[in-house]
């Protein structure tokens, strides 16, 4: 994951200091892209230990269409705790938009089911897109979508995915985002009987928080290690039937975890 370290270096060298919604302050660049060949290892950062269990459970939670953190809490995942209300609700965040985007007629669109059907029937379509950025419901969300929309692309029997992330916390959030969408691409590829292509990450406001600078320096002092392997142990009937136990991460030998505060 040298690409990830190169992004950090780029922000430190070329970024500008900006204020932000949280009041923390950031060093930021606008517009950056990384590409990961998913056939050459699973893109999970190795210069610090990442909590893959949380990444998997969060993705399964999105795919359930769930927007209450009870499932996450039951599985000891706390990454959404700061934004939930007293009942554990987050409003119509990712899961709601992915699985039940509301229409003017009162119906709802299951974007995940729809895009998989489209990949199977129209693999050359340029409309293989899922969006979480529902302008009409942003004010109801506890946090506006950071990873706003993603697009699939089929070529030579391989499935690729590109994510546009409008706002990116590079130290804490980005390793999760890359791994989550890489895993989602693997799952969709399996469901559509396609080989793995690339995961392309595109960032908008791409930043390091001012209170993550010491942690960033520590991470930059470490040498990346070989990427691990992610294996999906079975092919369930649909994208919605995967269980946590279906995923096996092997050969992950990261440097120690680096703790950092979350900007809320």
UniProtKB/Swiss-Prot annotation:
<feature type="binding site">
    <location>
        <position position="51"/>
    </location>
    <ligand>
        <name>(6R)-5,10-methylene-5,6,7,8-tetrahydrofolate</name>
    </ligand>
</feature>
<dbReference type="Pfam" id="PF00303">
    <property type="entry name" value="Thymidylat_synt"/>
</dbReference>
<feature type="binding site">
    <location>
        <position position="169"/>
    </location>
    <ligand>
        <name>(6R)-5,10-methylene-5,6,7,8-tetrahydrofolate</name>
    </ligand>
</feature>
<comment type="function">
    <text>Catalyzes the reductive methylation of 2'-deoxyuridine-5'-monophosphate (dUMP) to 2'-deoxythymidine-5'-monophosphate (dTMP) while utilizing 5,10-methylenetetrahydrofolate (mTHF) as the methyl donor and reductant in the reaction, yielding dihydrofolate (DHF) as a by-product. This enzymatic reaction provides an intracellular de novo source of dTMP, an essential precursor for DNA biosynthesis.</text>
</comment>
<dbReference type="GO" id="GO:0006231">
    <property type="term" value="P:dTMP biosynthetic process"/>
</dbReference>
<comment type="similarity">
    <text>Belongs to the thymidylate synthase family. Bacterial-type ThyA subfamily.</text>
</comment>
<feature type="binding site" description="in other chain">
    <location>
        <position position="21"/>
    </location>
    <ligand>
        <name>dUMP</name>
    </ligand>
</feature>
<dbReference type="GO" id="GO:0004799">
    <property type="term" value="F:thymidylate synthase activity"/>
</dbReference>
<feature type="active site" description="Nucleophile">
    <location>
        <position position="146"/>
    </location>
</feature>
<keyword id="KW-0545">Nucleotide biosynthesis</keyword>
<feature type="binding site" description="in other chain">
    <location>
        <begin position="166"/>
        <end position="169"/>
    </location>
    <ligand>
        <name>dUMP</name>
    </ligand>
</feature>
<dbReference type="InterPro" id="IPR023451">
    <property type="entry name" value="Thymidate_synth/dCMP_Mease_dom"/>
</dbReference>
<keyword id="KW-0963">Cytoplasm</keyword>
<dbReference type="InterPro" id="IPR036926">
    <property type="entry name" value="Thymidate_synth/dCMP_Mease_sf"/>
</dbReference>
<dbReference type="InterPro" id="IPR045097">
    <property type="entry name" value="Thymidate_synth/dCMP_Mease"/>
</dbReference>
<dbReference type="InterPro" id="IPR020940">
    <property type="entry name" value="Thymidylate_synthase_AS"/>
</dbReference>
<protein>
    <recommendedName>
        <fullName>Thymidylate synthase</fullName>
        <ecNumber>2.1.1.45</ecNumber>
    </recommendedName>
</protein>
<feature type="binding site">
    <location>
        <begin position="126"/>
        <end position="127"/>
    </location>
    <ligand>
        <name>dUMP</name>
    </ligand>
</feature>
<dbReference type="InterPro" id="IPR000398">
    <property type="entry name" value="Thymidylate_synthase"/>
</dbReference>
<keyword id="KW-0808">Transferase</keyword>
<dbReference type="GO" id="GO:0005829">
    <property type="term" value="C:cytosol"/>
</dbReference>
<feature type="binding site">
    <location>
        <position position="263"/>
    </location>
    <ligand>
        <name>(6R)-5,10-methylene-5,6,7,8-tetrahydrofolate</name>
    </ligand>
</feature>
<comment type="pathway">
    <text>Pyrimidine metabolism; dTTP biosynthesis.</text>
</comment>
<feature type="binding site" description="in other chain">
    <location>
        <position position="177"/>
    </location>
    <ligand>
        <name>dUMP</name>
    </ligand>
</feature>
<dbReference type="GO" id="GO:0032259">
    <property type="term" value="P:methylation"/>
</dbReference>
<dbReference type="GO" id="GO:0006235">
    <property type="term" value="P:dTTP biosynthetic process"/>
</dbReference>
<comment type="subunit">
    <text>Homodimer.</text>
</comment>
<feature type="binding site" description="in other chain">
    <location>
        <begin position="207"/>
        <end position="209"/>
    </location>
    <ligand>
        <name>dUMP</name>
    </ligand>
</feature>
<keyword id="KW-0489">Methyltransferase</keyword>
